[in-house]
Amino acid sequence: MKTWLMGFSEFLLRYKLVWSETWKIRKQLDTPVREKDENEFLPAHLELIETPVSRRPRLVAYFIMGFLVIAFILSVLGQVEIVATANGKLTLSGRSKEIKPIENSIVKEIIVKEGESVRKGDVLLKLTALGAEADTLKTQSSLLQARLEQIRYQILSRSIELNKLPELKLPDEPYFQNVSEEEVLRLTSLIKEQFSTWQNQKYQKELNLDKKRAERLTILARINRYENVSRVEKSRLDDFRSLLHKQAIAKHAVLEQENKYVEAANELRVYKSQLEQIESEILSAKEEYQLVTQLFKNEILDKLRQTTDSIELLTLELEKNEERQQASVIRAPVSGKVQQLKVHTEGGVVTTAETLMVIVPEDDTLEVTALVQNKDIGFINVGQNAIIKVEAFPYTRYGYLVGKVKNINLDAIEDQKLGLVFNVIVSVEENDLSTGNKHIPLSSGMAVTAEIKTGMRSVISYLLSPLEESVTESLHER
């Protein structure tokens, strides 16, 4: 052990001696400083030793490798948006109201101007519907006559029950205020004439019935007389036959008495037959007497029903004509501003369903109506975010609008340039573009491009998709 320690100490001392001697001559061992051109005249191996290779290529290589690694990591982790681009235009939402006439009319008065603010119910235009006023007056006149006819038949109906003519008194209604005295007299005359005609017919039937009853009384009296005569002649005939049996009188006297009895019996049968006939005639006369009243009553009730139906139809017709006149005064359906005013000439003619102006509500918003190509429609859903770029204002300077997909048409439409496309509506959050402190209002009809965000994908997937597509297609055999 002692020997090992001694050897180790000598070893350390030896290294110390060598290091100290070397340290003393360290400057002598340094390579002499030479200029660059001096190194070029040295032997090749010495030149290589004196001028080592620069580290710049190595650093550049390290930098490129690091950049590639970072780019690969970012391409795997980073993602980009998948958007479907659709061209379209700005449109007003369905809350904007188009003002149209219901029929051909003449412009009577223009109340509003372009851009003017209006409140709900304000008058916008006054039109004159062709023939509306004349139709209203005609219907009012016909309706008044129908109501007067109704009163006439109501009075006649009551007169049948009372058997006398009630006093004519018009109801206290607004539409009877303008009835003239001549019209009242004419109506009274018609009522009296019809009532008198019915009374005369009834009187004639009553006279006929009384006549038949008088004839019946006469026949009854004769029947009573011949019943007595027949009874007396029958008694005498029995007496004569008794005397003939006793041979107290001649047979000729019995035959003569028998002839008298037969004549009396025949007369009695004739008058009884006449009584049956007169009874039948009296019954028929009674029916005719009642029929006169019943026919008159049925006629009055039928006329009353027809008049009531006519009043209902004329009332509906009058309401329609009044609605036509009311519709000729066009009012604002909502509060907002007048836009796209197309009527400027009083006395001009407007046609049915022609748009006269548009009332844009105060809180109305814009929408984008865009055409999405068939290849993109499968990835678009309601609620997806979208960016709207207005063609008239470059988005790099004025920005863009933000919106969401509101509705997707489920049926394709044919476009001459794009083929089969789908109509998509995108709601817009703002109605103007902002640049600094300036707001630029947008209007309906401006061309826009809608970029609808349909999803996300990694950058590496985006870069490799062309290669993947090429490889996939190249491995197929035709």
Swiss-Prot record:
InterPro entries: MFP, Secretion_HlyD_CS, T1SS_HlyD. Residues 81-478 are periplasmic. The chain crosses the membrane at residues 60-80. PANTHER family: MEMBRANE FUSION PROTEIN (MFP) FAMILY PROTEIN, MEMBRANE FUSION SUBUNIT OF EMRAB-TOLC MULTIDRUG EFFLUX PUMP. The keyword Transmembrane applies. Its main location: membrane. It comes from Escherichia coli. The keyword Transport applies. This is Hemolysin secretion protein D, chromosomal. GO terms for cellular component: plasma membrane. It is a single-pass type II membrane protein. GO terms for biological process: killing of cells of another organism; protein secretion by the type I secretion system. It is found in: Cell inner membrane. Pfam families: HlyD_3 (PF13437). Involved in the transport of hemolysin A. Belongs to the membrane fusion protein (MFP) (TC 8.A.1) family. Residues 1-59 are cytoplasmic. Keywords: Cell inner membrane, Cell membrane, Cytolysis, Hemolysis, Membrane, Signal-anchor, Transmembrane, Transmembrane helix, Transport. NCBIfam families: type_I_hlyD.
